[in-house]
Amino acid sequence: MKNPESSGVSSSPQIQRVSPSSSSTSPSPPSIGTSSCFTLSSCTLPIAAVVVAVDVVDIMSVDPLAMTSAFSISSLPTTGPLGTIAVDSITLLYTPICLCYLLVRLRKVNFEGNKLLMVSVVNFVPL
């Protein structure tokens, strides 16, 4: 009776050993996919950097239509995974720049408004 139980116990670890070996082969494709995605993202980051740099030049020149250059992102190819990742990374990088641009524009308008208010007060005092 003891011999069949020990043989049954020894057969179950063999089955368990087969299962981890089959599961160890399945993590290999995700690691390959991860490395290929990493390669795609490393390829798209320079594209995003160039587009963002062009937009920063537009913003630094205080172009009032610099916000409309966001629509130029739609001209990028979005059919493949490269285009999708490029648009996503450009959106992530472009949104803070647009918000900063709006804040600078609002602050500049506020500063000019205060300047006009000070000029009008100075002109009003001598009268």
From Swiss-Prot:
Its main location: membrane. It is a multi-pass membrane protein. GO terms for cellular component: membrane. Keywords: Membrane, Transmembrane, Transmembrane helix. Residues 9-34 have a biased composition (Low complexity). The chain crosses the membrane at residues 47-67, 84-104. It is found in: Membrane. Residues 1-34 are annotated as: Disordered. Partially overlaps CTI6. This is Putative uncharacterized protein YPL182C.
